Amino acid sequence: MKNLKQLVLPCYKLEMAMSVEAWYFLHGSTDGICNLTYLLSLLSKMTVSEVQNTKRGLGYAVHPGQADGSMLVLAKEWGIGRKAVSRLLEDFSERGLIRVDSNPVTSIIDMVCVKSWMIAGRLIENPAYRQTVKAYEGAVSYTHLT
């Protein structure tokens, strides 16, 4: 797993919304590492503009608010098994943090808990955001990066 201090997010401000259950889950751990660290790793892969990628000769688009995250690549980066990655992504999905769409080429991860981000003074709404909790049911986190 990358050192948390080395993670670089694609923008300097994020607005996220999540349930209290998701918030508590992020403060738990998987394989001795805080679950928030894994989510931050996914956030560092999130695109803020459309990106065209190619794997095995097949092209595909990664849209704003999505991350390209094959299970094998994440397993290697995070230092845990592929099944552990799959379970962790499933846990994130069940708590309304992400949505995973897998195909034979890769897994596209929608960062559905990210409401918006700010780049160059512009607020950009996340097209992948899905409101899963009402304001009184969850927590909103504003993450400022410098």
Model-derived regions: residue spans:
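Short, cationic-aromatic polyanion-contact patches
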Residues: 104-124
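Short, amphipathic alpha-helical interaction segments positioned at domain boundaries
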Residues: 117-138
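Short recognition helix of helix-turn-helix/winged-helix DNA-binding domains
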Residues: 1-72
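Conserved small/polar residues in nucleotide/adenosyl-binding loops
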Residues: 143-146
